[in-house]
């Protein structure tokens, strides 16, 4: 059984070695670079591919996978929208993901982001750096325990966030087209219209699908309370970024914490200090005084990295052994 790992990061390497030690019958080779048309020949001789792509792969890469008789592509992420399901299916290549590498990590990040927004952490830091230590109305805060928090998307991550928000005393409501009983321990289900119109903080936790694309847009923003705070630790494509910027400039949305952007692929995870951001919308989001932007790192904990490596390799080898795999995506 032979597997190859692409786009291996420094912090992932020890966990790959740890996994290999407990699976001596599996050959696992690694490359630090992402898989592209330029290095696709490196796939030859492998049955399983483990990747974490930030940019879509060229069609010829999928064709080469088929020519090499690759059996499975395992992504080390929960999201799989960057892979071409049509071409994978065409070449008989199965797809797996890591549906849950650390919901708690992302839930913690959502809570931390909401606290930074509602307690005006960025504004306070700006005043302090100017040695302005006055108590003043722009930094007067509302406690989360006196707020209603709306959770859009109540899967594993949404539930983790709801549990943490409830833990600080917030009234937590949620909406999901597929509600589940487990979530009711932490939140009360309401309609999407009610969630949008009554929440003081809205936290997004849905996957990127056709139905969720630009779910947050000019129309849905208009339904929200004036002065609402928005937290997105999900996928960038669930927000119409231009509509968000317009609403921030008009004061409809008081502040936003964004850990994802729809077209972030060319920029993360990279040092862009010497490279201009040519995407003007992205540049405005990053620089906006009422936006806390982070480069898709809500998940980024030691626990999550270990789970991403172990679970993706486990899924890959499970498929190669011909066994049922709970992490397989139906194509």
Swiss-Prot record:
EC number: 1.1.1.28
Transmembrane segments: none
Highest taxon above the source species: Bacteria
Residues making up the signal peptide according to the UniProt record: none
Family of the protein in this entry: Belongs to the D-isomer specific 2-hydroxyacid dehydrogenase family.
Enzyme kind, highest EC tier: oxidoreductase
Name recorded for this polypeptide: D-lactate dehydrogenase
Gene it is expressed from: ldhD
UniProt keywords, alphabetically: NAD, Oxidoreductase
Catalytic activity annotation: (R)-lactate + NAD(+) = pyruvate + NADH + H(+)
InterPro entries listed in its UniProt record: D-isomer_2_OHA_DH_cat_dom (IPR006139), D-isomer_DH_CS (IPR029753), D-isomer_DH_CS1 (IPR029752), D-isomer_DH_NAD-bd (IPR006140), NAD(P)-bd_dom_sf (IPR036291)
Binding annotation for NAD(+): 156-157, 176, 206-207, 233-235, 259
Catalytic site: 235, 264, 296
Alphabetical list of Pfam families matching this protein: 2-Hacid_dh, 2-Hacid_dh_C
UniProt keyword Metal-binding present: no
GO molecular function list: D-lactate dehydrogenase activity; NAD binding
């Amino acid at each position: 059984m032979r597997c190859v790992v692409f786009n291996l990061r420094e912090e992932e390497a020890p966990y790959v070695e740890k996994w290999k030690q407990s699976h001596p019958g599996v050959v696992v080779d690694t490359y630090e670079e992402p898989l592209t048309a330029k290095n696709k020949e490196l796939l030859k001789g492998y049955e399983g591919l483990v990747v974490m792509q930030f940019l879509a792969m060229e069609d010829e890469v999928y064709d080469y996978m088929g020519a090499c008789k690759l059996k499975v592509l395992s992504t080390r992420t929960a999201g799989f929208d960057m892979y071409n399901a049509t071409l994978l299916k065409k070449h008989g290549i199965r797809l797996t993901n890591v549906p849950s590498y650390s919901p708690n990590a992302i839930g913690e990040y959502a809570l931390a982001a909401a606290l930074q927004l509602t307690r005006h952490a960025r504004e306070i830091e700006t005043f302090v750096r100017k040695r302005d230590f006055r108590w003043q109305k722009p930094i007067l805060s509302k406690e989360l325990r006196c707020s209603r928090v709306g959770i859009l998307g109540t899967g594993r991550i949404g539930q983790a966030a709801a549990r943490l928000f409830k833990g600080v005393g917030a009234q937590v409501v949620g909406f999901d087209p597929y509600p589940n009983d487990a979530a009711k321990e932490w939140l009360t289900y309401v309609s999407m219209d009610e969630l949008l119109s009554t929440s003081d903080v809205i936290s997004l936790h849905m996957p990127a699908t056709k139905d969720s694309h630009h779910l947050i847009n000019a129309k849905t923003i208009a339904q929200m309370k004036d002065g609402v705070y928005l937290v997105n630790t999900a996928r960038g494509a669930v927000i119409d970024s231009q509509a968000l910027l317009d609403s921030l400039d008009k004061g409809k949305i008081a502040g936003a914490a964004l850990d994802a952007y729809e077209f972030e692929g060319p920029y993360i995870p990279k040092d862009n200090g010497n490279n201009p951001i040519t995407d003007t919308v992205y540049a405005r989001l990053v620089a906006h005084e009422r936006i806390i932007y982070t480069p898709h790192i809500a998940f980024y904990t030691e626990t999550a990295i270990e789970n991403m490596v172990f679970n993706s390799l486990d899924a890959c080898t499970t498929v190669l052994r011909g066994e049922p795999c709970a992490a397989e995506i139906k194509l």
